[in-house]
From Swiss-Prot:
Ranges for region Domain I: 1-63
InterPro entries, sorted: DNA_helicase_Holl-junc_RuvA_I (IPR013849), Hlx-hairpin-Hlx_DNA-bd_motif (IPR003583), NA-bd_OB-fold (IPR012340), RuvA (IPR000085), RuvA_2-like (IPR010994), RuvA_C (IPR011114), RuvA_C_sf (IPR036267)
Gene that encodes it: ruvA
Annotated segments matching region Domain III: 148-208
HAMAP family: DNA_HJ_migration_RuvA (MF_00031)
Species, as recorded: Streptomyces griseus subsp. griseus (strain JCM 4626 / CBS 651.72 / NBRC 13350 / KCC S-0626 / ISP 5235)
Signal peptide: none
Protein name: Holliday junction branch migration complex subunit RuvA
Length: 208
């Protein structure tokens, strides 16, 4: 198992960071939130989980060990693979997921792209005794999904700047996709940050 990778960031993409380790570039799949804290040329340390398939080896990266642990625990539920587990962490923090499961908050889970009503009900049953209670004292005050719902602009802008775009370009791209985010909030769901990032990049590519 590769527990973590540490080294300078060689490259950043919308879903991937390349970390140079001993002269080798390790491609690591990350959420937009994790990517937003990385900068090309700067040192980084990512907790990692290696997913082995017959035709691929995929390394998933996380800001800390807690995110990695939750990522791996989520996959113990039937129907949850690494991509869905990562999507859940892109939408909610580890503690927000723990709170959602411990309180039976079906709405919080359906805010994740790829999880419907029946899927959420099944996950609540299967994960109830696996994730445990929230470990952060602040979670009860901030509520489930609050960081993603209210902070999607900051996440998106930081991710775009991390990819090498100027602040002005990032601001314009964020404003361009704002209606999509606001529509999600109006429906009571968290803005889909990964999809918003892709849409923002498409906007920037068209402008060039």
């Amino acid at each position: 198992m590769i527990a973590f990778v540490s080294g300078p960031v060689a490259a950043l993409a919308p879903t991937t960071a390349v970390i140079e380790v001993g002269g080798i570039g390790m491609a690591v799949q990350c959420t937009p939130h994790t990517l937003a804290d990385l900068r090309v040329g700067r040192e980084a340390r990512l907790a990692t989980s290696l997913v082995v398939r017959e035709d691929s080896l995929t390394l998933y990266g996380f800001a800390n060990d807690d995110e990695r642990q939750v990522f791996e625990l989520l996959q113990t539920a039937s129907g949850v693979g690494p991509r869905l587990a990562q999507a859940m962490l892109a939408t909610h923090s580890p503690d927000a997921l723990r709170l959602a499961v411990s309180t039976g908050d079906e709405k919080a889970l359906t805010a994740v792209s790829g999880i419907g009503k029946k899927g959420a009900q099944k996950l609540l049953l299967e994960l109830k005794d696996r994730l445990g209670e929230p470990v952060g004292a602040h979670i009860g005050q901030q509520g489930i999904g609050t960081p993603v719902t209210s902070g999607w602009r900051d996440q998106l802008q930081a991710a775009l700047i991390g990819l090498g775009y100027a602040s002005r370009e990032a601001d314009e791209a964020v404003n361009a996709v704002a209606p999509q985010a606001e529509a999600a909030v109006a429906e009571g769901t968290a803005p889909p940050v990964p999809q918003l990032l892709r849409a923002a990049l498409q906007t920037l590519n068209r402008a060039r």
